[in-house]
């Protein structure tokens, strides 16, 4: 049994399609990065305000000494949410650096507070919050891919 196969290929259409994709790629990458960076900042902020670690679980409890302090009594939430005035999480932002984005704290004092909370410097317990959990990491990959494909016209 012999089969005949004829393939018709329009090279002009293929070339134009590839040009369109390559033209839209830089903008698509930057916009997709901005979208996932905003999502990452939202997730870090939201989970921290709920007192959750990035991969689940709760932060180490406040010390008994802190629970007796005037500062603690002024606090709205009595669970560990790393918020006293709200300046640290409000200064969390992202910036585009070419084909990568970085998450950072806008003010130096908030950066220092975040480092102390995240690493547990001195007598402070470790309360890792400035990270992306596995579940959110997969969601970020999905958001990036869908937005990128939409903007480039792939698929």
Explain the meaning of each model-derived region.
Residues 1-155:
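Short, Lys/Arg-rich flexible segments
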């Amino acid at each position: 049994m012999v089969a005949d196969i004829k393939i018709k290929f329009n090279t002009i259409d293929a070339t134009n399609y590839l040009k369109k994709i390559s033209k839209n790629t830089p903008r698509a990458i930057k916009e997709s990065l901005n979208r996932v960076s905003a999502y990452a900042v939202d997730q870090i902020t939201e989970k921290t305000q709920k007192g959750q670690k990035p991969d689940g679980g709760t932060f180490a409890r406040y010390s008994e000494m802190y629970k007796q302090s005037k500062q603690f009594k002024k606090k709205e939430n009595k669970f560990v949410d790393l918020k006293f005035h709200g300046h640290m999480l409000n200064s969390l932002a992202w910036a585009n650096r070419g084909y990568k984005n970085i998450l950072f704290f806008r003010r130096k004092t908030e950066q220092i507070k975040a480092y102390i909370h995240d690493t547990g410097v001195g007598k402070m317990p470790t309360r890792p919050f400035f990270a992306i959990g596995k579940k959110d990491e997969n969601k970020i990959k999905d958001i990036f891919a869908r937005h990128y494909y939409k903007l480039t016209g792939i698929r």
